[in-house]
Each structure stands twice: as C-alpha cells, then as structure tokens.
Amino acid sequence: MISVVYPGTFDPPHLGHLDIVKRSCELFDRVVVAIAKSPRKYLLFNLEERVDMFRVMVEPLGPKVEVKGFDGLLVDFMRKEGLRIIVRGVRLFTDFEYELQIALNNSKLAGVETIFMMPSQEYIHISSTIVRDIASYCGTLEGLVHPYVAKKLREKFHCP
C-alpha cells in the first residue's frame, strides 16, 4: 500500500488543492492531507476551521483521504504517521524553485521523497492569497472554492 502526504497551510483550501488530492487518489492508495498550524503566519482561519473545510471538500472521495492537523516539522508528522512520500502542487516556476529547496532538505534530513504535480489547467491560476483577496471584497468565489468554503469566507468577511 502506497501512502502519501499532501501538506500545506490551506488558508483557505481551494479547488486547486482539491484537484491535487483527487489526482493523488488515482495514483496512490492513501492520501493524508496534513494541515500545518503555522503559528508564524498570519492566518485567516484557525487550524480547526481549515481541517473542517478540507474534510467537507474531500468527503465524497471516501476513506482513501484523511485530513489531519499538525504542529511542528512535517518530517516529524510523517515519521509518526509512517509516511515517506510528499506530494506538492506546483503552479509556476517560482513555486518549483522554492519547493525544490524544501524537497532537497527533507530528503537529506529525513530520507523522504517529494513528488511534484502540476494542477489541472483550469486551476493553475488559483491561490489561497487570491481567494482571500477576492473574498475580502465580497467578490464571487464560484469556480475557485468549494461552496462550503465560500460560505465560511462570506461569514468571515461579513458578506451577504
């Protein structure tokens, strides 16, 4: 059985994230979405809210997908969960450069492998930052996030 971890802050999770999870399910037996607490970042949603939103998004995918929050180093979480493979979505060359540095360090420090996936074309333009910006002006989120995430964003920004 091949299990992978798909880590991130996911603040908020969007359809590009869901695309990577769905496609990972086609390739691997088990996908663990690991949501980082990330206390050094300013976050719109707390860890519990982000875990909740991601769980709702992946519910139709069934038991192949688990969503868990974690605090600390990803490699420590992976060791605890018995995971050795990281899946990362890479949209642009600048993403790849940053992700490659992290992947090389993870490999050297903990012997874990990283697999890079390009998002599907219809999601390549989506980022959590863009979603937050649009939501902060009560703009339309259709085609960017799951309806449940859109509801949570509207509530957070007091949108009608």
Give residue ranges: language-model regions:
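Nucleotidyltransferase catalytic core that binds NTPs
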Residues: 1-160
